Swiss-Prot record:
Taxonomic classification: Eukaryota, Metazoa, Chordata, Craniata, Vertebrata
Glycosylation sites: 194, 237
Chief site of localization: endoplasmic reticulum
Protein name: Nucleotide exchange factor SIL1
Organism for this UniProt entry: Bos taurus
Keyword annotations of the record: Endoplasmic reticulum, Glycoprotein, Protein transport, Signal, Translocation, Transport, Ubl conjugation
Length: 462
């Protein structure tokens, strides 16, 4: 054992010497190594990297289509994209990749994977811009031709659903059914009304149906053209109150805003006949319809207004208003007077400002001396006393008329103590009602407007 330790002690320097010799040789080799095998050569390294990338790009297959896997293994061709979630394996016998769906996707495909995996590399040099323009032009032309064809087919389908009126008339004639125009219907109704063999009920029914048709301006003028208007006017002379009532009902509808019919009615004596009904003892419903026809005849027809004054129309209306039980008609009469007064005033103002009105029509309005006639015949007092009516709507219309008559009736109103008392009472009443409206959040309510009219009238009369 001492012999072995001595041997190791003597060999130690030799090992150190050999180690130093090996290190020197290694350094010598590094210093004289060929630069071709250097670890860092920037130029050659960059060149080789570029070549490597180009080679990889050439080797990388272009993805042109999406592979749609099933539940069976299928070979995957180069360039096909695999949807996310598919199962892929390498067939060791053939060397091909195979794809199928996972078992949990047995009843549905992975739509999300399809959408994400649908990548197509399109070669932009395949189609030129001119090719795309030509294709688009052909597409539009084809669409227009298709739309035109669709329109023709749709029109043909609609035509098959309907038949010409002449064919329908012929078929109806074979079935003893006649298609009548409005004109033919009105002729038939007038003949029914004018026939001596028709019962009272049949005549009333004919007038009732006729009123529906003459609301249209053209139909009312057609009624005039074949003489039907005069037949209805003559019906105002009937001894049957119902015939008078419904005849006036038809005339009121035909007169409304229809100047041609209004002129023919004046010439046919309609105004006189209506005033007779209003001046004689008749049922309230008959007088109501007669007043309706009179209002339709007078509005916007200054010549008829002149004739109304000449025939004593204001006296007839005054008697009607003062008749007991005619309060409903009294409000309508006051409304008519207000409309006539303001119509004349606005017509004269418009003529001065715009010169649009014909001189003849303006002259007709100037010959309607309505306000002086109202003052002379006591309408200032009559209108003021109607303010005692209990209905708010009636009071509103009376207040409007009092305002329109103020310039003419100011002196009469000043002397009318009953009017002042009534206005004071109404002022207190509507102050309370307006206060309630204000509490409910209505700053400009209905009662507030009535109160303003009363306050304005009282201010003018002080």
């Amino acid at each position: 054992m001492p012999h072995q330790g001595l041997l190791l002690f003597r060999m130690a320097p030799l090992c150190v010497l050999l180690s130093m010799l090996m290190v020197s040789c290694f350094n010598f080799c590094l210093c004289h190594k060929n630069s071709e095998f250097a670890l860092t050569n920037p130029e050659k390294s960059s060149t080789k990297e570029t070549e490597r990338k180009e080679t990889e790009e050439e080797l990388e297959p272009k993805i042109l289509e999406v592979f749609h896997p099933t539940h069976e293994w299928q070979a995957l061709r180069p360039g096909q994209a695999v949807p996310a979630g598919s199962h892929v394996r390498l067939n060791l016998q053939t060397g091909a990749r195979e794809v199928k769906l996972h078992d949990e996707d047995k009843f549905q495909t992975n739509l999300k994977g399809l959408k994400k995996g649908k990548r197509l590399d399109i070669n932009t040099n395949t189609y030129t811009s001119q090719d795309l323009k030509n294709a688009l032009a052909k597409f539009k032309e084809g669409a227009e031709m298709e739309n035109s064809k669709e329109d023709q087919e749709r029109q043909a389908k609609v035509k098959r659903l309907f038949r010409p009126i002449e064919e329908l008339k012929k078929d109806f004639e074979e079935l003893n059914v006649v298609i009548e125009t409005d004109m033919q219907i009105m002729v038939r109704l007038i003949n029914k009304f004018n026939s001596s063999s028709s019962s009272l009920e049949e005549k009333i029914a004919a007038l009732f149906d006729l009123e529906y048709y003459v609301h249209q301006m053209d139909n009312a003028q057609d009624l005039l053209s074949f003489g039907g208007l005069q037949v209805v006017i003559n019906g105002l002379n009937s001894t049957e109150p119902l015939v008078k009532e419904y005849a006036a009902f038809v005339l009121g509808a035909a007169f409304s805003s229809n100047p041609k019919v209004q002129v023919e009615a004046i010439e046919g004596g309609a105004l006189q006949k209506l005033l007779v009904i209003l001046a004689t003892e008749q049922p309230l419903t008959t007088k109501k319809k007669a007043l309706f026809a009179l209002c339709s005849l007078l509005r916007h027809f200054p010549y008829a207004q002149q004739q109304f004054l000449k025939l004593g129309g204001l006296q007839v209306l005054r008697s009607l208003v003062q008749e007991k039980g005619m309060e409903v008609l009294a409000v309508r009469v006051v409304t008519l007077l207000y409309d006539l007064v303001t119509e004349k005033m606005f017509a004269e103002e418009d003529a001065e400002l715009t010169w649009d009105m014909s001189p003849k029509r303006l002259q007709q309005y100037r010959q309607v001396h309505l306000l002086p006639s109202l003052q002379e015949q006591g309408w200032c007092e009559i209108t003021a006393h109607l303010l005692a009516l209990p209905e708010h709507d009636a009071r509103e219309k009376v207040l409007q008329t009092l305002g329109a008559l103020l310039a003419t009736c100011r002196d009469r109103f000043h002397q009318d103590t009953q009017l002042h008392r009534t206005l004071g009472t109404l002022q207190a009443e509507y102050q309370a009602l307006a206060a309630l409206e204000l509490q409910e959040g209505e700053d400009e309510g209905y009662f507030r407007e009535l109160l303003d009219s009363i306050d304005s009238l009282l201010t003018e009369l002080r």
